[in-house]
Swiss-Prot record:
NCBIfam families: cmk (TIGR00017)
Protein name: Cytidylate kinase
UniProt entry tagged with the keyword rRNA-binding: no
Binding site for ATP: G18, P19, S20, G21, T22, G23, K24, S25, S26
Family: Belongs to the cytidylate kinase family. Type 1 subfamily.
A GO CC term attached to the entry: cytosol
GO molecular function, one term: (d)CMP kinase activity
GO terms, biological process: nucleobase-containing small molecule interconversion; pyrimidine nucleotide metabolic process
Reaction(s) catalysed (UniProt annotation): CMP + ATP = CDP + ADP; dCMP + ATP = dCDP + ADP
Localisation: Cytoplasm
Superkingdom of source: Bacteria
Amino acid sequence: MENGAAPTAPAVIVAIDGPSGTGKSSTSKAVAAQLGLSYLDTGAQYRAITWWMVTNGIDTDDPHAVAAAAGKPEIVSGTDPAGPTITVDGVDVAGPIRTQEVTSKVSAVSAVPEVRARITELQRTIAAAAPLGIVVEGRDIGTTVLPDADLKIFLTASAEARAARRSGELKGADVHATREALIKRDAADSSRKTSPLAKAGDAVEVDTTALSLPQVIECVVTLVEEKRAGK
């Protein structure tokens, strides 16, 4: 930093992967804020392109139609962990992308190779431009998007714990139905041909089932600080 400020820690790129309901978003945002890093929710980008497909009448069950439209929407992600934003063609879609309709279609859209290529390129560009480093959360960050990330973390939790957390986030959601939906999405994301949900071989696995959010955050912050100290 200029103006006689204390030298900053080396820029660090942190990849946090895992299925839904493991605490990825809450952990990633808090860690980024605590360490002065940028933050990127890659799931929101896939939700955003899915929302655009639905809004524009694209049949999300037709991979050819989805592939043909993949390059059309302009998706912009704000990376401030205190208030991350996402817009599509200039429209704020932070709320609309969290609907049940988008949630039910995002796996199918995300499985289309042309969509993954488009969004992956966008994610790499954002990560490379982060001045002090970035925490990037998703499902294939450590394996595909940023295989050279300084630190890779894979969050896990039991299906029951994840369902309870997700149903708390989705107003009025039934825990049993949420659990079934999570298991179905895990299967879809883990079995897709292009960039499946998977733990990188060099990732640190953190089971969040019995941990409070502050405990998970503390664990990840410690891992990042150890990695930065060794750079």
